[in-house]
Amino acid sequence: MKRIIQLLSCVLLLSALSGCESTQQILKSIEQNYPATAGGQLTTADIAAGLKQALEVGAQNSSNQLSALDGFFKNAAIKILLPEEAQKVEKTLRDLGMGSLVDKAVLSLNRAAEDATKSAAPIFVDAIKSMTIQDALGILKGGDFAATNYLKTKTTSALTSAFKPVIQQSLDKVSATRYWSDVFNTYNKFATNKINPDLSGFVTDKAITGIFYQVSLEEQKIRKDPVSRVTDLLKKVFGSKEAQGS
């Protein structure tokens, strides 16, 4: 049962981290290179070797998807916009014919997030490798977002530490942070509702929120319809008595 729980939980996390097509390719490779022994059991060595390959590829795929050009900018669900409290200022600028300036600012925020996301893969892999049997059971039997919540708990601090300096550097390239600070520190002198002048902190939070949003969508898919996304090996494992809790 221990080996089955390890396989199920890690594959669930892998599927949450990578796209459908990539996940199927990875799992097929595991089946081909690490076949089940007689009786349908996988050895500890098989599982360790297969998961090492799967986790490395899956985590990299996840990072690649979001760090690609327009990975954030052209995804309406996670595109980073100006803070809500700054939207009145944005409207004023657009009314004054400075819409292109605002558009460039928004683009710079998303480019910074895309740059930072390149560092996500090794952080996710470290978290998955540290997963205990208790963690695995909780994920397997948990709610729709158990894997996502596990990753949030284990990686948010590390992601923040890794992302913020990259985002800061990316924004500094276009002087975005300086302009932001100058404009909104001045604005805050007269405004009742202050605007946070820490632009890199704002973008970091939004980038991390976007990553976990994507992970949660993938987790829901595999939980609601696992048969449609796994190989024969996973169908067999999900249908086992141990996996069903009997």
Task: Tell me the role of every PLM-derived stretch.
Residues 1-8:
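Bacterial N-terminal signal peptides that target proteins for export
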Residues 21-24:
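Bacterial signal peptide processing site
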Residues 26-108:
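N-terminal Sec/ER secretory leader and immediately downstream segment
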Residues 66, 98, 119, 149, ...:
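Alpha-helical transmembrane segments and their juxtamembrane interface "caps"
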Residues 99-170:
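Mid-length scaffold segments of soluble, non-membrane domains
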Residues 166-208:
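An amphipathic alpha-helical core segment
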